[in-house]
Amino acid sequence: MPPALHSIPSRRELIREVHVYAKSSTARGLALFALDIGLYITAIAGVLFLPALWMKIGAAIFAGMVLGRMFSLAHNAAHENIVNGRRLNRFLATVLFTPFFYNYRLWVYEHHTLHHPFPNDVKPDAYKPFSKDEFDALPSWRRALERFYRSPNVLGWGVYYLLQRHWSTKIYPPAYLPKELRPAAWRNTALLGIYCALFLGLLAAAPLYAANLSAMEAILLGFVLPLFVFEVHDGFALYVQHTDPRIAWFKGDVDRNAEGRTELLSVHLVVPRPMGWFYHDTFAHPVHHLHPKIPCYHVYRAQTHLDRRLGSAAVVSKFGIAWLLDTTRRCKLYDWDRHRWLRFDGTPTTEPIAAVRQGDCRRLEHGAALRTST
């Protein structure tokens, strides 16, 4: 184990400490479920029945924001932590996933089996960075798309998640899904198809009952715009959770009790408390990787405890324009051999990450390394 890791508590010790927060409340979980579903129904009702177009557009955007909120709660329910009982958690997760077309069975396999215990490695995953050689080997259109994805713009997050993750891994079973899981996954795909047909039918019939709304307008404002706003939310959340100049990615075997500890490979993005509350504290991410049975309504306090125990080894960033511009400017490509981030032209933007885990395990100061070269 590198000397730097001796200066912080062991993973086992930290899990034991934060386990006190892993307490589910069925009443609280059901209340949050009812609130999220109620907010979504209210937003869609606003699209259908508010009189002015600008009001309908506002309701559509809010519906997409609520879908982002629902994703966080569904994520927790899929970890079986928002209420007591496995079956009820699974039911709530399936219901919450359906309006934004997530296949519950695919999510459980990909997220629980592939991502959660093994983040930041070479398998396909959200925002896995290209090496310089990989990037240079891409066709010109794909290089341009990667530049678009990793620029600080909301459209990039939405387009990335829609094309690279949602459509290809969250709706129908991909080729890598184990054979024994495929029947259940296809049944869930059928559920999504039935829901989609019914919902689109409801929107297409809007001229019969809605206020000042054609069928096309209803589909655009009730279906297309909310889903794209959701894609933006999901793309942004998944980008910031594992992308940071202090965060390493690994090829080959890595010791998940040492330099590959999951709580050291994810970011705690400190957001204003109203934003944290609205999104069920999805940005308190490291402690979720450490102990996924902690429900969203306790995760902020658990994350605060973890940050205090990790000290300067914790990866903590404050939400803001300066943080976003710095991160997106520096985290373009990754040198998988020397563990440092690069610009698209191959210029390093950080020192090798292993070098900052010296002595007391202090992390690279955000924005400090090689600033003159960027």
Where are the model-predicted features located?
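Histidine-centered catalytic micro-motifs
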Residues: M70-H79, W107-N120, A237-R246, F278-I294
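Membrane-cytosol interface motif
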Residues: R90-L96, F250-L264
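Transmembrane alpha-helical segments that form the membrane-embedded catalytic/substrate-channel core
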Residues: M65-A74, N103-W107, V154-W167, F223-G252, ...
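A structural signal for short secondary-structure junctions
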Residues: W277-A284, Y300, L325-D326
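Aspartate-rich (DDxxD/NDxxD/DxxxD) Mg2+/diphosphate-binding motifs
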Residues: L73-F91, P119-S131
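Active-site-adjacent structural elements in folded domains
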Residues: A78, P183-A185, H268-P272
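Non-catalytic, topology-defining segments of multipass membrane proteins
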Residues: M1-G64, F97-V224, Y297-T374
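Membrane-embedded alpha-helical segments that form the functional core of polytopic membrane enzymes
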Residues: F49-A74, F91-R105, F223-E231, V267-D281
